[in-house]
Amino acid sequence: MTIKVLSVASEAVPLVKTGGLADVAGALPSAVAPHGVGMTTILPGYPAVMKALARPRALHTWNSLLGEKARLVSGKIDGHPLLVLDAPAFFQRDGTPYVDSSGRDWADNWRRFAAFGRAAADVAGGAVKGRAFDLVHAHDWQAAMALAYLRFAPPPGGRRVPSVMTIHNMAFQGHYGADLFPALGLPPQAWAMDGVEYHGGVGYLKAGLEAASAITTVSPTYAREIRTPEFGMGLEGLVVSRGNRVSGIVNGIDTAQWNPETDPALAARFGVKSLARRVTNKRALEAEFALEADDGPLFVVITRLTWQKGIDVLLECIDHLVGIGGRLALLGSGDKAMENAFHAAATRHPGKVGVRIGYDEALSHRMQAGGDAILVPSRFEPCGLTQLYGLAYGCVPVVARTGGLADTVIDANLAAVMAGVATGVQFEGVNYPSVSDAISRAVTLYRQPDVWRAMQRAGMKTDFSWSRSGKAYADLYAALIAEDQ
């Protein structure tokens, strides 16, 4: 029997993406399908999403969804069922899903994503004829209210199905003032410590965590970390109270899109048995970033330029990296002061440091294929994808020991190197001594070609496809449904 799951997400590739959440939401339907799960994704009707619908068919209408007219339309996403909340007053606007064209949060985000949650709860609860689901899976705060509505205000005659709440990043919680509670259309009993109330206001993510049958994060280590004040962001007590209902499942990567043997973006394709071809990609990348061509290690960085990503410390380490024979190519954007500081570093070290501000998907592939090591000094990283891409492409990860980075990279300590299982370099603490020492370790390992090549091969042989992760989610769904019967 096929398990029918409604996946509630505010973004999903290939239709709309601002971060890693979109990669997961887009990959999940195909990942769980071989394990007896039929997944339907529901998305807000942003302009790009509506444009991608060939012939949208209306399935349901709301005359007043938090005060606005809306309809539910159907389509496909990579061959899987797609539902879209077509609510122009909420979603047909310029900018990104969450911010306007000037980069400021939409002032009515509370209302937009409450409406999305209300609609998703109606769909999951059986209000739409011909659409029945066994379980609902919500992603991050933008989808969390779906679980609160199912718990406190299911559709008339609807049923409360089991649910999963996935935390992709605890730093984003959707916390709003108490004055908006009456507009949410929830009963008075929802205003409670075990409901939507959070520090005197309304907490969207908190409400979803309280209502969920099970909570997942995107790595086992992050599932443990969010039980602590350092990573729990104020919700650690709630996470601890949920006990064994909290678990971590590492994200997979799309091995069709990220495969060095078939990648059309590369100057030279290669595999685990043809690593010598990587040098062609290295030479091409050096030329693309106006770097000197030499045999020293080329470090790459592909990231948002933010404090979370440890970029401030990386900036401190550039002189050290260059001083011991390394070079650096960076692709990213974010904090303007950090952007300017990287430009200054490139001016200070011509031919040694190259910088591209912005994001370019094809370039990110070329960097993974041409770089020798990828630096990921994040202060916290729920899962992380760039290190997984690095492993797949023989670009050895140098990572902070946190979250998914700790779960996916095997440190090149003596025992791991001797056993042939080391895949990268881990360091403890995001500060100058730790990061600079990790860079030095990477350079030392790079200068031992046999060891470095063994690390590359071990990483490339590691299975980080969605197959394993898909089975873990499918097993969780089945267990929750069995428990509910």
Curated annotation (Swiss-Prot):
What EC number(s) is this enzyme filed under? 2.4.1.21
Specify the superkingdom.
Answer: Bacteria
Q: Which Gene3D superfamilies match?
A: Glycogen Phosphorylase B (3.40.50.2000)
Residues noted as binding ADP-alpha-D-glucose in the record, renumbered to the chain? K17
In the UniProt record, does the keyword Glycosyltransferase occur?
yes
> For this protein, what is any one GO molecular function term?
alpha-1,4-glucan glucosyltransferase (UDP-glucose donor) activity
Its keywords, alphabetically, are:
Glycogen biosynthesis, Glycosyltransferase, Transferase
* Any one GO CC term of the record: cytosol
Name the protein family.
Belongs to the glycosyltransferase 1 family. Bacterial/plant glycogen synthase subfamily.
Q: What role does it play?
A: Synthesizes alpha-1,4-glucan chains using ADP-glucose.
The cross-references to PANTHER family, in alphabetical order and at most eight, read:
ALPHA AMYLASE DOMAIN-CONTAINING PROTEIN, GRANULE-BOUND STARCH SYNTHASE 1, CHLOROPLASTIC/AMYLOPLASTIC
Q: What is this protein called?
A: Glycogen synthase
Q: Which organism is it from?
A: Novosphingobium aromaticivorans (strain ATCC 700278 / DSM 12444 / CCUG 56034 / CIP 105152 / NBRC 16084 / F199)
